Every structure is written in structure tokens, then in C-alpha cells.
Amino acid sequence: MEKEKKLNPSLPSGFEDRWDKKLVLKKQLLKEIENNFIKFGAEPLETPSFEISENIGSFLAEDEANPMSDVFSFKDGDKSITLRYDLSSPLARFVAQNNQELPSVYKRYAIQNVFRNEKPGNGRYREFMQADFDIIGNTNPAQANAELCNLITNTLLDCGLNKEQFTINVSNRKIVQGLINELNISEEKQLKVIRAIDKLDKPGFGLTGVEALLKKERKDASGAVTKGADLNDDQVKQILDFLKIKDLKELKQKLTNELSQEGIKELEDFFEVINFGNAKDQVQ
């Protein structure tokens, strides 16, 4: 007689059950978040859990040998489909599909789970919820960004934080791209450089972690190695010096290339607009 198999009551690595008080609190916070999204004029959007893999894009992964390694993908006939990695890729696909039916300025919010095939860690899960608010279309960038900062401020206050408990850091990608162009960093290395800079404020990184990723490689506490951009010493120094600058006037003097200056001007316009909103004391 075949032995009866016993059920192993466990979860896959990187996933968790959410229940009781923790789930009740989550639902309360989501209600505040959604109410603010609606107050700021956004319409809800739900997209399927799966997208066609080629629409997700190989830019998501850092491993050139296996560019889709950070996502969960499956074969569906002659196509590959991927579990939703974020809420931005589905939005881009939706707008491209429905562009003719959308208003010239389209505000949408989405609150859905996303899935990452990444190494789990403390507080780092393979399935988690994102809440996105986006403004798409013909609008003034400074006003749109100020509106988003006011939305963030109002939402966090309604969720129970006070103004002393959070700040909103802003930047402009044109400033970074201008520096990258100025340093003659090759195109195949640029994405790694941008990803390294984006990790500056991430716990456990700081300037030391960014420096390692700008060089040959970074080894984390577990011993896992991430391949770096392999820049030369002067390029690394210039980027680290740039990251230490906190004053917009100093930045304007240091980066004289046209693209960076354009990004700095957009930031200046933003700070003029934000002075009239609820977020003026929260933004830096």
C-alpha cells in the first residue's frame, strides 16, 4: 500500500501570509491613500497580473547574460508572459493601446501587487504591494511634480505621520545624464551608472556602496557579487564629488553642460511652484 504523503505547511521563500491586525492596519492605510489619489483627480486603473514579456523590457535586470532574471516568466504558447514586475510597464502598455481615448492630461492611480524574482531578505519580499499615481500628457512639469509632492505630503499626514517624520528628496535625471555625457561614459555602461547612483539612499549603500558599483563589483554582506560599471578612477571621483553636492547654486557652477543646466533650471522652476503648496517644508 502506498504511503500517504503528508502536507508540508510552508511558504515559498520570499512570500508571507498577511492577517489579523497587520492586515487591518494595511487596509486602513490603503483607504487613506486611495482617498487622496481620488482627491487629486486620478482615475483608478487595474491591469492583468501578466504582461507579454517583451513589453516588460530587458532593462529591468542587471544581469546582461540573463536580462529577465528578476521576473517570473512562463511560456504561453508561442509567447512568453511575465508576472507584473511594477506598475509603470503596464501603464505604458495601456496608454500606448488606448492613447486615442485618453484625455490630453491623464491622471491614473493603481494599487496592486507586484512580483520580483529577487533574493529575499529582511523586509524584502518577492510579492508586495505598490501604490502609484501618475500624470501623463501635456502639462507643466514643474506644476505636475509639485502636485505629486503635495499629494505625497497630504497622504502621509493622513496616514498618521507628522511633518517632522519625513522629507521628500527631489532631483532631475537630466542633471545626471548631462554629467554622464560630460564624462564620456560609454552607452553600454550608462544604465549601470544610473542604477548605482539611484542606490545612494538605499540602506547599506551610501557613497561606499555606490563607489563599489561604479568600479568593478560590489559584494554584499551575504557574499553575493554584483558586477559594477568598471569606470576609470577619474570618472568615479567626479561622480562621487557630484553626489556630495547639496546646494543647487553649487551644482549650477560645477555642471556647465547644456543638458545638466536644463535639468537644474527645471528644478529651480519646481522649487518656485512648490513654495505655494502644502509640501514646501518637506521637499529638499
Model-predicted segments: where are they?
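TRNA-binding/sensing appendages of the translation machinery
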Residues: M1-Y85, S89, A146-C149, T167-V170
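Positively charged, Gly/Ser-enriched RNA/tRNA-binding surfaces
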Residues: E2-K3, L25-G41, E51-I52, D78, ...
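Short, glycine/charge-rich beta-strand/loop segments that flank catalytic centers
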Residues: T47-I56, Y106-N117, F166-V176, A196
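Short acidic, glycine/serine/threonine-rich loops at helix termini
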Residues: I56-F59, P120-G123, G178-L183
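Acidic, His- and aromatic-enriched active-site or binding-groove loops in soluble protein domains
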Residues: N66-D78, L183-L214
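Short, well-structured alpha-helical patches and their helix-loop capping segments
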Residues: L83, P103, K107, Y125-E127, ...
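Hydrophobic mid-domain F-helix/FG-region of cytochrome P450s
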Residues: T153-L157, K174-E182
